[in-house]
C-alpha cells in the first residue's frame, strides 16, 4: 500500500445540490451522520456543507450543525435572475425559449441580487460561518457583453461581502473553455478577474 500525503487544502464537499425530496430535516440528519463518519479519520479536515433544495441560498436558515462543529464552509448556489442565466435552455421552465435576454446592470436588475446577497451576508455573520457561492454562471446562449457585466457585478458583490466563489462551469453549456477550439473565453475571464 502506497501512502499519499494529503494536503490541508483538500476539503470534503459532502453533497452537491442535495435533492429537494430529502428536505431540510433529512439533509441535516444526513450531514450529521456524514460528519461523524468523516471526523473519525479526518478530525481537522474542512468540510463544505451545501444548503437544502438543490443548494439554494434562500435555504441557508434551514441548516443545522452538530454542536461544536466549526470547521465548515457553507455553500450555496446562485443563478438569479433565472430568465437571464438559463435563457433558452429547454429543460428550464423559466428559460424564455426563443427570446434573447440581456443583462444591462441597471439598478433595477442589481437590486434583487443585492437584496439576496445581503440576506446571505447577514446569515453568515449571525451564524459565524463562512459562505462560499459554490456555483454561479450564465449559459452560453446569452450575449457576451451581458455575461461580462453580470460576471463583473457578481464578483464585485462576492468580494464586498467576503464570500469565496466558483464559476460554473469549465466546459459545456455554461463553460469558460471551448473543448473544440481548445480556447478559453478571454472576455469572461477578464470580467471575472478585473471587476
For each of these PLM feature ranges, what is it?
Residues 1-107, 114-139, 160-166:
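Active-site region of glycoside hydrolase catalytic domains
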Residues 53, 113, 191-195:
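Generic hydrophobic, helix-prone segments enriched in Leu/Val/Ile
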Amino acid at each position: 500500500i502506497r501512502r499519499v500525503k494529503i494536503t490541508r487544502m483538500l476539503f470534503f464537499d459532502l453533497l452537491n445540490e442535495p435533492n429537494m425530496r430529502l428536505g431540510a430535516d433529512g439533509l441535516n440528519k444526513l450531514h450529521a451522520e456524514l460528519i461523524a463518519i468523516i471526523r473519525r479519520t479526518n478530525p481537522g479536515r474542512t468540510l463544505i456543507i451545501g444548503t437544502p433544495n438543490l443548494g439554494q441560498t434562500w435555504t441557508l436558515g434551514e441548516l443545522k450543525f452538530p454542536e461544536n462543529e466549526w470547521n465548515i464552509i457553507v455553500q450555496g448556489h446562485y443563478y438569479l435572475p433565472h430568465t437571464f442565466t438559463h435563457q433558452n435552455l429547454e429543460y428550464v421552465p423559466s428559460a424564455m425559449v426563443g427570446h434573447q435576454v440581456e443583462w444591462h446592470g441597471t439598478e433595477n436588475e442589481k437590486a434583487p441580487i443585492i437584496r439576496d446577497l445581503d440576506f446571505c451576508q447577514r446569515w453568515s455573520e449571525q451564524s459565524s460561518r463562512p459562505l462560499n457561492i459554490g456555483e454561479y454562471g450564465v449559459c452560453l446562449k446569452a450575449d457576451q457583453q451581458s455575461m461580462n457585466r453580470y460576471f463583473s457585478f457578481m464578483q464585485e458583490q462576492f468580494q464586498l461581502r467576503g464570500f469565496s466563489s466558483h464559476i460554473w462551469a469549465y466546459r459545456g453549456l455554461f463553460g469558460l473553455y471551448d473543448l473544440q477550439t481548445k480556447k478559453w473565453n478571454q472576455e469572461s475571464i477578464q470580467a471575472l478577474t478585473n471587476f
